[in-house]
Amino acid sequence: MYAKFDQTKAPLIIIEFTGEKANAQNFAHYLRSLEENYAREEQIALVFDARKALDLNPLYQMKQAHWLRKNKALIERYCQGVAYVVPNSFLRTMLGLVFKIQPNPVPFKVFENLDAGLVWAASQLEAQ
């Protein structure tokens, strides 16, 4: 499993990257699961926990950027903000490359620790 989705704190949703290397099957499952977060058509905030994430192949960077572009209207309508927990500076650079291909359509912030990301994401929901 490439990523686990924790909805126990919904509408605050935590996506934890497991450290498993991305492949065609698990990355497609990740993108489908990401889209399912919007199925309720309710306001949400996302926290991407990339503390265990591995480097992302450029092919999957492009797929992520395409997913953002394809779902831009859905994201803008329901997502109040996205916190990225990325302690690894190389992965932060890769995240920046994804956003150069397709800018993030909602407010976002990058954090080095999970607690700070959770607090910020919760505040985005409260601000709605």
Residues of each region from the PLM?
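Amphipathic, Lys/Arg-enriched alpha-helical "gate/interface" segment within cytosolic domains
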Residues: 1-128
